[in-house]
């Protein structure tokens, strides 16, 4: 039976995301566990187009975009020290973390 921990990180700022992945990877490597990643997932770009003027000048528009960056980390055969190290990692405020535990049979 092989267990895995999948950690998905999401952020609007790629610099804070890369810093968070470095902190997680170094914390896991201190426990001598095997880690795969960081695997960069496709970024999602949402674009919004709005009129500059509320009344006339339909051709005058402004465009905005939001870029969502994502990374994936996979830890193979985690031990209790890995879970303890992950709970003590302090990450930046703009990084969203989703942790999944996968048990293989």
From Swiss-Prot:
GO terms for molecular function: structural constituent of ribosome; tRNA binding. InterPro entries: Ribosomal_uS10, Ribosomal_uS10_dom, Ribosomal_uS10_dom_sf. Pfam families: Ribosomal_S10. GO terms for cellular component: ribonucleoprotein complex; ribosome. One of its GO terms (biological process) is translation. Keywords: Ribonucleoprotein, Ribosomal protein. Disulfide bonds: none annotated. Involved in the binding of tRNA to the ribosomes. Part of the 30S ribosomal subunit. Belongs to the universal ribosomal protein uS10 family. This is Small ribosomal subunit protein uS10.
